[in-house]
Amino acid sequence: MLKDCRDINTELLVAGTILHDIGKLFELDTNEFGASEYTVKGTLMGHAFLGAELAGRVAREEGLNEEDIMLLQHLILSHHGKQEYEAVTVPAIPEALVLHHIDMIDSYMYQFETQAEGLKPGEMSGKVFGLDQRVYRPTWRVPQKKEESEEKK
């Protein structure tokens, strides 16, 4: 689909997609059991700012030009889409808008799949806050348990 969008810089979009959450490495402190807590730096600055700062520093060391660095940082800083969703700024270029929507689809699908996992086939959930809708698990969509799919390999 994106190949039909003539004005999309796919290299920039792919780089932004890969790096948009890189700041979470510094925002969160995760222990060996997978439990996470926010770091002081992460709480004060947020993962978008920390990621944009890191990406800018590394890109300069690699010799990228300043406009490309600025645009990559813009994707990272604006990937939440709206300031009320904790975006530092709003998308101002097509690649940033596309990245925001990719990130939203990822978030929606995670919520949808997590909700559906707790349902029996043919069952409907209550209203899911983050989706602002209910979720239905079709009778034909019965995902295999992880152990079953591992045994078949």
Segments (PLM) and residue ranges:
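Divalent metal-dependent catalytic cores for phosphoryl transfer on phosphate-bearing substrates
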Residues: 3-118
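Acidic, carboxylate-rich catalytic segments that either coordinate divalent cations
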Residues: 95-153
